[in-house]
Regions:
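Acidic, Ser/Thr/Pro
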Residues: 1-212
Length: 212
């Protein structure tokens, strides 16, 4: 099986509905732009080497090579084989989380109790997005997830906390593909914490036309 959930025409924006998901393919050298329509909305991205999906994005390798835990333009993101996958070309918000991770039903129930049972989550969204490729949640992991526009803090006492997002309407992130990839994105559906400021909003995705 080899079927994306969407075929995106370069230069034609696609709206990613609140709590929605999408998968698509991108060629080496192409760039995609993710825009916050209303601001304060997080998206989770995982991506795979199209020629061998066992190679996938790695936040651990990206942090180790960059010697940083804050990624923005012009950082490069790396695979689990420490090969270049993405370059961040532009980032108006300047706030992304690279610790790895996505919300799941089990994690949300552990944190928020029974009210999270059956609630939409990014793990389910990402699995739905890649299903057309014959893959499921066991083909990706928390290390493979780049949290676009997400605000997380590490306090001096060791406290880790999700905080209100900083994105404003019209803020965008441009990612430059450094290898052919299968990309899956979840428009984060969580309402149990400040991740999306307790309201789900649309995002716009566009594969940019070639500069040449």
């Amino acid at each position: 099986m080899n079927k994306a959930s969407a075929v995106i025409t370069p230069g034609v924006p696609v709206t990613l509905a609140p709590a929605g998901n999408i998968s698509f393919e991108i060629e080496k050298g192409q760039r995609f732009k993710m825009t916050q329509c209303e601001g304060e909305q997080v998206a989770d991205l995982v991506s795979f080497n199209r020629d061998d999906p066992r190679e996938l994005l790695s936040m651990l390798c990206s942090r180790a090579v960059n010697l940083s835990y804050k990624f923005t333009a012009p950082h490069t993101l790396y695979s689990n084989l420490s090969r270049e996958m993405w370059k961040i070309d532009e980032d108006l918000t300047g706030e992304n989380y690279c610790g790895g991770g996505y919300c799941s039903e089990h994690m949300n129930m552990r944190r928020y109790g029974d009210k999270a049972k059956g609630a939409p989550n990014c793990q389910d969204n990402l699995e739905k997005a890649i299903r057309g490729y014959g893959m499921d949640r066991w083909n990706f992991n928390v290390d493979a997830c780049f949290n676009m526009f997400m605000t997380v803090t590490y306090d001096a006492d060791g406290k880790w906390e999700i905080r209100l997002p900083k994105g404003k309407p019209g803020d965008y992130l441009v990612m430059h593909a450094l290898m052919p990839q299968i990309v899956a994105i979840s428009n984060c559906p969580v309402l149990f914490n400040p991740c999306n400021n307790f309201r789900l909003k649309p995002l716009t995705l566009e594969i940019l036309k070639s500069r040449g």
